[in-house]
Structures are given as structure tokens and as C-alpha cells.
């Protein structure tokens, strides 16, 4: 049996070990290899693309299709360009209705450019390919992004090309032929003059999320296979002091590059706790420029200097939580006003507090709340009824969790015949679809309570899924779940007996609010980690599942089954024979 009572230090990422790093000024030099250190795979892919014998002129990069990511990739590509600043392109000389092309001799020529990297997250046809304009008989030619990127690299988001397939077909043709032809965008309105085509050589980086890449692969299977591929790594694994330093330098670089304040020495621990909540891992921190910039932009209004303090960051996070917390508070009010029945004291047979995460479309913050699961057992033919599934409110994953839970119980009891009970399980006061298996351990405990006729401690909530062998498996949304139950207990007054049971594998995901951490430190709230559902049963039901020399839950259930089977056997006689029993002397 493995039951671990977590200390307050287990509830947040370890930052005490890195105080010396936080105290150091993280000065960033323009020549620092920050990008290659944090994005080695993407850096290597760029080197392959820029090689004189590159296998393809196209590169696919998996990354969010936002300007921050495109600019980071563009800056990295610029540092690798060996021919940066080389004059390429040409000059169109327009004389009446006659247009002639010559080689560029200076950067001032209309279609000349110095080899560069151009990035755009959204473009229209004229922006990408340029256009011919005619006004009062005068003709002018406007260069597009492909002309600006001539001899260099064009970085563009995939959603632009997927939404405008004709742009992609023309761009691919230009890259493959290494030549740009002037054509009318509207076939019904041809160009008024003939414009000579021009040599144009460029490499293209297509940036997209997983869905965009999948759509592009379906549209261009051969090119997708031949293109150089890499990914922007959104997280950094913290394995030692060097990786912490690396992350701190990346955050500082991102802030300074965007003219925003960077974290001060006492702000780093708070930022790391918030970062761990974002990634869902204590030892994984985000490299996402969008996430970093959001924190720095919001706290910038609270500070005047080049750095922000821990107090300022903490205040910003509290303000954000309050600003986004209306729905969570209303849901808590429903419980506190007993419109939703959740007990946090006492004992109940077949009732247990599970934990769930609520996400509303359009709302930026997920929040947790307890859910009451109830189980009713009666004499029957061994049927287990999932009311959510029967009412078509349960998803497939939820149904799978229910079947796994039943399989474990039947395997443990080792019955020679069908169990003489029927049971029904449900999420009480749940009127929307339920899916996922994160409540399967709670459901199993409620079922065992009902079968054994032993009450469950209502001051303890539980989350976690379970496999067919009873092992507790990790689930998501853990911080929100624990904080949701803690908020209800806190409003009703903490007794020191309340707490939450989680799978041991979930401990690494914890990054809880300071208020909850303080309550655990003071012994007012407890979090237990278990490896197996049988480890949770003594905490919830005050009886062990199995053992020698003591009353156990398995023994209690087997005795109830034996009693029910005997009663069922008596009632199997035909009614005339049961009537004759009255005349048989004892």
C-alpha cells in the first residue's frame, strides 16, 4: 500500500535551488546563440534549407501562425544567410506602352533588392505577386513580397495559402521555374501591355499548426514528403541549472526585443509557477513568445522601470484571476447556496465527491468544481447501469472508463456466478454531456461503498482514472480541480480533515495557488497521492480492500453477495412448494 501525504513543497515547482541564477543579471548580446540553444532542430532545418545543395526549396515548420513566431524564424534565418545584402533582381523601364527589363545595377532600381528574409502571416494576391497599375495612361509596376524576397527566403503562413489555393499554385510555379511571369488576376480583364518575365529565385518556409499541415499534406502529398520539415518547440525541459539559465535568458530576450520590462530577481519564482500551470508540468517551461509577451505586457502597466518585481507580477495575476473569475464564482455560489448539493463533511453510502474541469467556449479560463457521483445497489441480475450513457449524456471515453472499472471489480471478487446485485451510477445534477475517464476511480470507490454498504468520507474528494488492474492513472486539469474543491471547503471553513486524493503520477503536474499551499503547510488541507485505487479506499471508507486478520471491504462485499444468493435461492421454488413449507414440521 502506497499512500503519500504531500508536503507543501511538492505542490509547486522547485525554485529555491535556483535563487543564485535569478539574482544574476541576464544580459543579452545580439550574437548570443539563444535560438539555436532553445530550437536546435529548427535551427538545423534552416541550415539545411540555406545549404547550396539543399534537397528542397520548400520547408514546412510546425508553429502557431502568428507574427511573433514568423519573426523569430525570420531572424534566425537572417543570421544564417551567407549572401545577405547581395544585389539581385532587375529594373523595369516603362516607355509609353513598351516595357523593357534590365539587370539591377543599384538598390534603387524598382525591382532590385538586397538578399533578405521576408515574413508575412497574411497576404492578398497583389501583396504577394505585385501588380500593374494604370492611371491617366501612365503605367507603373509595383513589386510584391516575392520580388522583395528574391534571392532570399519568403516565410508565409499556411492558412493564407489554404484559404487562397490559386496563390499557392502560382507561388509553387514561380519557385519551381525560378521565373516570375506577369499575369492578370482577373481573366476577364487582361493586362493592357505585355510585361517581360524576370528571373526570380527564392526559398519558401510554410508555417502552420498541425491541422494546417495536415490539410496541406492532403493537397500536396508529394511536396510535403520532399520538403524539409521541423517544429518550433514550445517548451523547455528543466533538468539542471543550465536549462533554467537558458529559459531565463530566453524570457529576458523576448521581453527586451519587444521593449517590455523583464522579470526582476524576486519575480522569477512566481513566473515559473505560472509557467508550470501553463504547461501542466513542474519541470517544463514554455518558450512560447505569445505567452511570455502576455505576462510582460500585462505587468508593464504596473511598473515604470526595465524590470518588474514579484509583488507587481503577483498583483497582475490576482487582477487577471479576478477579472476572469465571474463564472467560477457563480458556480461556487450555486454550491454554497445548496442549489447544487455537495457535502464537505460527514459520511454517505454510495456518494463521493469527484473533481471536474469546466470550460466554456469563448471564456479564457478553465476552472474546477466538485461533482457528486452517486451509486445505488439493489438485488438484481448483475447489470451495471451507466445513467449518463443511457440518457445519451456520456461520451465514448466515459463509457470505456466505466467498463474498465467493472472489469477490475469482477476480477478482484473472483465470483463463480453472476453477482446478485444490480447497480446504477450517475453524476448528480449534471445536465450536459460528460466525457473522459478522469472520474473512473471515484466511480469505482462509490460502487464499492454501495456494494459493501460502507459510507464514504465526504470531506475528501478524489480524481484519477483507473486501469483493469486498479492502478491509478494521471488525468488533466489537476490544479483547477484541486483549487475548485479547496475554494468550497474554504468558504465553508477549513476543518483540517478536508483534502483531495490524486494519482501519484500527477504530482509532477502540481503548481497550486499560494493560498492553497499555505493551507497545506498549516495542516488545514491535505493532498494525498496514491498508486492504486485500493490505496484510496482506507482514506475514503476507513476499511482496507483486502488483508488478513481484519475486516476488509472485499470480505464485506462477498458476505453480502452470499446472503443475497441464499435469499435468491429460497425464492426460486415454485409458489406451491413455498406454500407447502408451512405444513412441514421443524
UniProtKB/Swiss-Prot annotation:
The active site is at 438, 481. It comes from Escherichia coli (strain K12). This is Putative Lon protease homolog. Gene3D superfamilies: 3.30.230.10, P-loop containing nucleotide triphosphate hydrolases (3.40.50.300). InterPro entries: AAA_32, Lon_proteolytic, Lon_Prtase, P-loop_NTPase, Ribosomal_Su5_D2-typ_SF, Ribsml_uS5_D2-typ_fold_subgr. The keyword Hydrolase applies. Residues 346-543 form the Lon proteolytic domain. Lacks the ATP-binding domain. GO terms for molecular function: ATP binding; ATP-dependent peptidase activity; serine-type endopeptidase activity. Keywords: Hydrolase, Protease, Serine protease. One of its GO terms (biological process) is protein catabolic process. Belongs to the peptidase S16 family. Its EC number is 3.4.21.-.
